[in-house]
Curated annotation (Swiss-Prot):
One of its GO terms (cellular component) is cytosol. InterPro entries: Trm112-like. HAMAP family: UPF0434. Belongs to the UPF0434 family. This is UPF0434 protein Noc_2677. PANTHER family: PROTEIN PREY, MITOCHONDRIAL, ZGC:162634.
Amino acid sequence: MDKKLLEILACPVCKSSLIYKKADQELICKACRLAYPIRDDIPVMLEEQARQFDPEEEI
């Protein structure tokens, strides 16, 4: 994931910043508790494609 791209991306739901989780190839929004998948190095920033994650899940 390109660092500059990560700096400009925001959660499409709440506009919060995102955290890159390399091991799972996801972008995490802590505010919404959503994890957006990254497929073929392209972030899929669609709410319906995101998964809800448990607040106790390690980020």
